């Protein structure tokens, strides 16, 4: 996927902003141990800039890599890094159902992030696919469990995000079927990144309305 293709994705909280939390947030966290004030200021500036110009962080990173003549598969690298918890998305409520939601989302993202290491070993990759399917089901079961137990004024937003997650899960499944025909791993990486992004948006939506 080219930069322009990623930017043209018509979805809220666009996937191009994944670079902010997958790449830069860990940098801010490290800086925070040395200079908390500077880290906080820098984080706020990047968040504001990314909100106003989705994809800006990715543009900056790509320009730096280009200037340093570093050639990497950015989509693959992003997938490898995207499994880490993002504090801004984690649900703080102490009830077990919400902590289960955090845990199931974490498990799914972790399995998806292993795809680049598994995809060239057919046996291991087939097992990874089974693990992903199970993790998706467990996350959806947990979402439904929260729905049953808690009432929300903004239930429509939650239902919408759940439908988006299901849509991208099916898209990921379709991408896998195509991969076994054409062998294009990059499309699997792109689809996995989208699914991780939707997983984070589920957490974000629950955190916002919970």
Curated annotation (Swiss-Prot):
State the organism named in the record. Danio rerio (Zebrafish)
One family from Pfam that matches here is PDCD10_N
Q: Which cysteines are joined by disulfide bonds?
A: none
User: What keywords tag this UniProt record?
Assistant: Angiogenesis, Apoptosis, Cell membrane, Cytoplasm, Golgi apparatus, Membrane
Q: Which GO terms describe its biological process?
A: angiogenesis; apoptotic process; blood vessel development; blood vessel morphogenesis; chordate embryonic development; Golgi reassembly; heart development; heart morphogenesis
Compartments it resides in: Cytoplasm; Golgi apparatus membrane; Cell membrane
Q: What is this protein called?
A: Programmed cell death protein 10-B
**Membrane topology (UniProt):** Peripheral membrane protein
UniProt cross-references to PANTHER family, sorted A to Z: PROGRAMMED CELL DEATH PROTEIN 10, TF-1 CELL APOPTOSIS RELATED PROTEIN-15
- Under the cellular component aspect of Gene Ontology, which terms does the record hold? FAR/SIN/STRIPAK complex; Golgi membrane; plasma membrane
UniProt function note? Promotes cell proliferation. Modulates apoptotic pathways. Increases mitogen-activated protein kinase activity. Important for cell migration, and for normal structure and assembly of the Golgi complex. Important for KDR/VEGFR2 signaling. Required for normal angiogenesis, vasculogenesis and hematopoiesis during embryonic development. Required for normal cardiovascular development. Promotes cell proliferation. Modulates apoptotic pathways. Increases mitogen-activated protein kinase activity and STK26 activity.
How does it associate, per the subunit comment? Answer: Interacts (via C-terminus) with CCM2. Interacts (via N-terminus) with STK25 and STK26.
């Amino acid at each position: 996927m080219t930069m322009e293709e990623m930017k043209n994705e018509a979805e809220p909280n666009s996937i191009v902003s994944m670079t902010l939390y997958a790449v830069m947030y860990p940098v801010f966290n490290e800086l925070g141990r040395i200079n908390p004030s500077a880290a906080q200021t820098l984080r706020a500036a990047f968040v504001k800039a990314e909100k106003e110009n989705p994809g800006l962080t990715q543009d900056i990173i790509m320009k730096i890599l280009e200037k340093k003549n570093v050639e990497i598969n950015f989509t693959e690298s992003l997938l490898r890094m995207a499994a880490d918890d993002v504090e801004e998305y984690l649900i703080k409520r102490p009830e077990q159902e919400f902590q289960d939601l955090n845990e199931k989302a974490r498990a799914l993202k972790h399995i998806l992030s292993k795809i680049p290491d598994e995809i060239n070993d057919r046996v291991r990759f087939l097992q990874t696919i089974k693990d992903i399917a199970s993790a998706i089901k467990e996350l959806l079961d947990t979402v439904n469990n929260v729905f049953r137990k808690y009432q929300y004024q903004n239930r429509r937003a939650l239902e919408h995000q759940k439908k988006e997650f299901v849509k991208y899960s099916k898209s990921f499944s379709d991408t896998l079927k195509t991969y076994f025909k054409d062998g294009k791993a990059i499309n699997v990486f792109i689809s996995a990144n989208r699914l991780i992004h939707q997983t984070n948006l589920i957490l974000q939506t629950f955190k916002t309305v919970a």
